């Protein structure tokens, strides 16, 4: 989306320059258009930098900022377009529209949250992620304003604080949450052991669990910029809130992982 929005001021600027400079040759139109496109992108980056200064670096927010969300989602779509990522989606109709939920998925690449957040952009959705992602230049403050939460898996008490915070936001109907229970990327594409405690978010908030899978993101870095990457996002099943509440996290983990391994063939 942002990719095309940047073309609008670039084309308009090029048209103005052309009509104000009658002696300008047609051969100069393409370089001028390219220069205006780059300039428009630089202005957007500058805007994001300035806006990031107004977001608290360590603060947890209790509502999503529509302004920061719009800018971040636009950037997300822009990056996906520039990287020539074609997303194939299956089962999106299974995602609840009448309640919040916890979204869980396998994790193969740093592109996973970008792809899946874009696919689920119709739903207010925040991610639980590692603390280092919240400290990233410019992006960190932006995702915090979108209610993303850091989780310290090395400290059980801090992790529980994050789980409770996510559950509270869900109960307050602020947003749904997404988490990768593996806790890190699988470099072999095989499903890694899950942190069962991640599912406590759904139990505490009394919401369903949406189980998704992602395939193909592990090839994006190798394909850019020469080849298009095909990524497959599938919504496998939705576990009702009643079942989530009545089942232990270990049993839920065993059931979900078993089905996910069978679906992925790993």
Locate each region found by the language model.
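Residue-level preference for the first positions of well-ordered beta-strands
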Residues: 100-102, 174-180
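Soluble extracytoplasmic domains of inner/organellar membrane proteins
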Residues: 166-167, 190
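A cross-family acyltransferase "interaction/gating" segment
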Residues: 137-141, 145, 175-178, 187-251
């Amino acid at each position: 989306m942002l990719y095309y929005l940047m073309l609008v001021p670039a084309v308009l600027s090029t048209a103005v320059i052309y009509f104000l400079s009658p002696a300008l040759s047609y051969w100069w139109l393409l370089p001028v258009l390219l220069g205006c496109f780059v300039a428009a992108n630089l202005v957007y980056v500058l805007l994001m930098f300035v806006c990031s200064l107004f977001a608290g670096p360590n603060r947890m927010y209790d509502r999503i900022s529509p302004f920061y969300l719009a800018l971040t989602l636009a950037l997300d779509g822009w990056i996906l377009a520039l990287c020539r990522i074609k997303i194939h989606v299956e089962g999106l109709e299974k995602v609840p529209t009448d309640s919040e939920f916890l979204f869980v998925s396998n994790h193969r690449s740093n592109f996973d949250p970008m792809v899946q957040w874009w696919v689920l952009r119709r739903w207010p959705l925040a991610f639980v992620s590692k603390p280092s992602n919240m400290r990233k230049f410019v992006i960190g403050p932006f995702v915090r304003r979108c209610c993303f939460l850091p989780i310290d898996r090395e400290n059980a008490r801090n992790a529980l604080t994050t789980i409770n915070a996510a559950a509270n936001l869900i109960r307050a109907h602020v947003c749904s949450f997404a988490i990768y229970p593996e806790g890190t990327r699988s470099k072999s594409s095989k499903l890694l052991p899950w942190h069962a405690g991640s599912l406590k978010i759904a139990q505490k908030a009394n919401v369903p669990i949406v189980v998704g899978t992602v395939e193909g993101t592990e090839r994006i870095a190798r394909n850019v910029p020469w080849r298009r990457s095909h990524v497959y996002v599938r919504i496998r099943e939705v576990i009702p809130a009643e079942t989530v509440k009545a089942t232990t996290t270990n049993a839920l983990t065993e059931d979900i992982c078993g089905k996910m391994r069978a679906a992925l063939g790993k």
